[in-house]
A protein has these predicted regions:
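Active-site-flanking beta-strand signature of metal-NTP-handling nucleotidyl enzymes
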Residues: 2-10, 52-54, 108-115, 181
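Short, surface-exposed ligand-recognition loops at beta-strand->loop->(often short) alpha-helix junctions
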Residues: 10-21, 115-125
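An amphipathic, aromatic/His-enriched active-site/gating alpha helix that lines ligand/cofactor pockets
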Residues: 28-37, 56-90, 135-142, 157-180, ...
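Short beta-strand/turn micro-motifs at beta-sheet edges
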Residues: 40-42, 96-103, 167-172
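N-terminal interaction modules that seed assembly of large macromolecular complexes
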Residues: 44-56
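Surface-exposed beta-loop interaction hotspot
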Residues: 77-137
Length: 222
């Protein structure tokens, strides 16, 4: 079964050119990994500076064998350590649902990370997939997927010297949460706005906010 590894890294704001150059080198390195199905790297669209790396592996065996040389977290530490401003977060996930519209070129994207209590996870999964299936009847989306964290493989990596990071990690790795990732891509800003004003999306968004904690990352593909 394919394994999705999502890695989020925050970097200093005034080193964008340096950060982009180093992330491209990391991307070139990852492409050589045995068992890699695909890799996507996004950078933030907001005033903050962060990068979101998505790698898909044929199965978990290939991923575990690639740890030393191709784990995005290790590559980030080796190439960008002085640019990192906070802990690096990494989730091991399984795909639940996906969509791609032929001939639509994704130019902007967003990642919705939702944390819920375990007893809500199955309900969230069913409701979210149903809502997304209704949304793709509209032509706004170019590409999208929904994934769910494998809780037993959760990895939160942080700077041991930073008290805040330690507190965050301790809170995040407990057994009282499940994480979902929904990545959405659009051909342009008009389609993105149309998507977010759709009543089906508003219904999903309201439901997710009522049962969990929602983070939204505004992204540009690299």
């Amino acid at each position: 079964m394919e394994l999705l590894v999502a890695t989020l890294a925050h970097m200093v704001r005034d080193k964008d050119d340096d950060g982009i150059t180093r992330m491209r080198l990391i991307s070139e390195t990852i492409q050589n990994a045995p068992g890699l199905v695909n890799a996507r790297i996004y950078r933030s669209r907001e005033p903050e500076s962060y990068y979101f790396i998505l790698t898909t592996w044929e199965d978990e065996d290939f991923w575990y064998k690639a740890q030393d040389r191709y784990n995005p977290t290790n590559l980030l530490r080796g190439a960008t350590e002085e640019l990192l401003t906070a802990y690096t977060e990494q989730w091991l996930m399984r795909y639940l649902w996906g969509y791609s519209r032929p001939f639509a070129q994704p130019t902007i994207a967003a990642a919705h990370i939702v944390t819920v209590r375990p007893e809500q996870a199955e309900r969230v999964e069913r409701s979210w997939i149903e809502g997304l299936r209704r949304l793709v009847t509209q032509p706004a989306l170019a590409f999208a997927f929904l994934a769910r964290e494998r809780n037993e493989d959760r990895v939160i990596l942080h700077d041991q010297s930073t008290v805040n990071n330690i507190k965050f990690a301790e809170a995040s790795i407990n057994n009282y949460s499940s994480n979902f990732l929904n990545v959405l891509s659009w051909p342009g800003e008009t389609q993105r706005k149309d998507f977010y004003t759709d009543q089906n999306y508003k219904a999903i968004s309201g439901f997710l906010s009522s049962v969990g904690v929602v983070r939204v990352l505004a992204l540009d593909p690299m």
